[in-house]
């Protein structure tokens, strides 16, 4: 498998591109440490390779697995005007760089699986987490969840969850220690565990105390000079603003009275947003700003609002206050996603992260207007505009063969038209109002992920459980086969039962929706 690595020239190009364009997303791999490992790797002799993995230094056995994942991510996020020599990596006329990226990532996965049988290493955990990044980005979300579980278990085997921070303030030195990087990797593992647990309705396997997470660095160094923020600063800023509450939100189902903790978390997040450091605010000075920072902060804004969104979504049908707050968070998510999309290269449109937050937020916004047409009417003009922009974004992603965007678009377009018909019943769809393409509504129902929104958005909806649209899209769409092999785990708030009814509102036969007494009690 080592022979599948590209030439040194191509490796150098892609490694440079990775740390310039991609690494800031999660800050999983430290550049100085990685380059040191790469230099050591290149000093290995042919004889060492011939004698097999046991002849390699322990610290380098997992390195090629990580290298393959770095190359894969770099290829996946190449700009449209990429270096011409990268086309040499293609060996067929119809290949794209993303095809080669998938092959490299698969090779890295096979190597990581081979070395897991021996002693786990931090480099191996990084390789597994990078593989989960690739799977999530390319739409294999269920597979990413399984890979994440493997990485978490190996990290626990290494004791990464037991490492205490050396300082209450994050410090980026010229060379990151294994201890510091291990702690950083564990934080990302925890955040992914919490986020995917909420999105997929799965149990969490990690816990983390906010007291054990360092704060972002000051905007000035020890000499008082201005210093640019680092990717880790953005992640830590988002964590202490909102991400730290994800594990509490995941556990809300265990509480009899959820109103007090929900209100407390909401107010704390608002206070934290108001107290963001100057470099992280929308009103910040952009002079001398590193090129990655704008997209990183926009991603952070989306994720912070997602926490507010996730906090209130389970209660939108039972509590008007939560309904309005979830609606506001969804609108802010869509505005943030629009700004982020404007910064995204077309070649990155296959990245499924551009679908996740947009789809969930659009479904909730439309559902609230459909179910409660007399509420938030003053917001409807803005809602209509922002949904139309979201639909156009999904169409752009669909045109770049983003399969999940294709399924999401079919649902959202139908919800959009149902919303128009509900709020303004005098308007006819034949007039072409709404800004969407009428031809898209002639698609056969079997080509889309069905959703019985006509059934669930009825006047007696008060006791019906709240949807997890993205989870249902993954369960019912083209990823259903891979999901069917996944462990059957209960979803929070009984949302799997809710999802069973999401079949057929747009003309197909639907399954009957059965609600038990226990389910009704949980919903209330």
Region locations from a protein language model:
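Eukaryote-biased recognition of C-terminal alpha-helical segments
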Residues: 368, 388-450
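Short coil/turn segments at secondary-structure boundaries
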Residues: 28-35, 84-86, 121, 200-203, ...
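Long, amphipathic alpha-helical regulatory blocks in the mid-to-C-terminal portion
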Residues: 96-128, 147-168, 188, 215-222, ...
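C-terminal transcriptional activation/regulatory domains of eukaryotic transcription factors
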Residues: 1-123, 131-140, 172-176, 222-229, ...
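Fungal transcription factor middle regulatory core
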Residues: 36-39, 79-80, 84-90, 155-287, ...
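Intrinsically disordered, low-complexity transcriptional activation domains
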Residues: 400, 429-524
């Amino acid at each position: 498998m080592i022979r599948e690595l590209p030439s040194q020239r191509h490796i150098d190009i892609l490694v440079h591109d990775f740390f310039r364009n991609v690494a800031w997303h999660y800050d999983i791999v430290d550049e100085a440490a990685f380059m040191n490992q790469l230099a050591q790797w290149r000093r290995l002799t042919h004889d060492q390779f011939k004698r097999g993995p046991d002849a390699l230094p322990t610290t380098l056995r997992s390195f090629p697995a990580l290298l393959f994942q770095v190359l894969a991510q770099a290829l996946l996020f190449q700009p449209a005007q990429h270096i011409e020599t990268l086309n040499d990596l293609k060996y067929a006329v119809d290949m794209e760089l993303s095809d080669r990226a998938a092959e490299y990532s698969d090779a890295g996965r096979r190597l990581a699986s081979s070395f897991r049988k021996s002693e786990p290493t931090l480099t191996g955990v990084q390789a597994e987490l990078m593989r989960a990044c690739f799977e999530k980005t390319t739409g294999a979300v269920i597979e990413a969840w399984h890979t994440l579980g493997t990485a978490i278990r190996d990290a626990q085997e290494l004791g990464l969850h037991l490492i205490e921070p050396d300082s209450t303030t994050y410090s980026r030195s010229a060379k990151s220690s294994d201890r510091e990087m291990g702690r950083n990797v564990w934080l990302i593992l925890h955040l992914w565990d919490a986020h995917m647990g909420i999105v997929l309705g799965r149990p969490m396997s990690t816990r983390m105390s906010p007291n054990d997470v360092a704060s972002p660095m000051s905007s000035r160094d020890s000499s008082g000079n201005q210093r640019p923020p680092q990717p880790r600063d953005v992640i830590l800023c988002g964590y202490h603003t909102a991400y730290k509450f994800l594990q509490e939100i995941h556990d809300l189902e265990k509480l009899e009275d959820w109103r007090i903790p929900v209100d407390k978390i909401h107010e704390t997040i608002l206070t934290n947003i108001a107290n963001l450091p100057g470099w992280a605010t929308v009103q910040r000075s952009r002079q001398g700003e590193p090129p990655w920072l704008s997209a990183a902060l926009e991603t952070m804004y989306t994720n912070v609002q997602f926490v507010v969104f996730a906090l209130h979504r389970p209660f939108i049908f039972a509590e008007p206050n939560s309904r309005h707050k979830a609606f506001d968070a969804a609108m802010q998510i869509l505005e943030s996603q629009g700004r982020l999309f404007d910064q995204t290269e077309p070649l990155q449109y296959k990245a499924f992260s551009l679908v996740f937050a947009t789809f969930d937020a659009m479904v909730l916004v439309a559902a609230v207007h459909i179910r409660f047409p007399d509420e938030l009417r003053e917001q409807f003009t803005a809602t209509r505009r922002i949904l139309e922009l979201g639909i156009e974004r999904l169409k752009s992603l669909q045109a770049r063969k983003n399969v999940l965007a294709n399924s999401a678009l079919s649902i959202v377009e139908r919800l959009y038209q149902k919303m128009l018909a509900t709020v303004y019943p005098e308007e006819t769809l034949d007039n072409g109002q709404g800004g969407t393409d009428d031809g898209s509504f002639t698609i056969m129902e079997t080509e889309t992920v069905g959703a019985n929104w006509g059934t669930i958005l009825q006047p007696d909806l008060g006791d019906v459980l709240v949807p997890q649209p993205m989870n249902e899209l993954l369960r019912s769409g083209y990823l259903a086969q891979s999901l069917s092999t996944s462990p059957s785990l209960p979803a929070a708030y009984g949302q799997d039962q809710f999802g069973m009814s999401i079949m057929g509102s747009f003309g197909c036969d639907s399954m009957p929706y059965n609600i038990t007494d226990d389910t009704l009690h949980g919903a209330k």
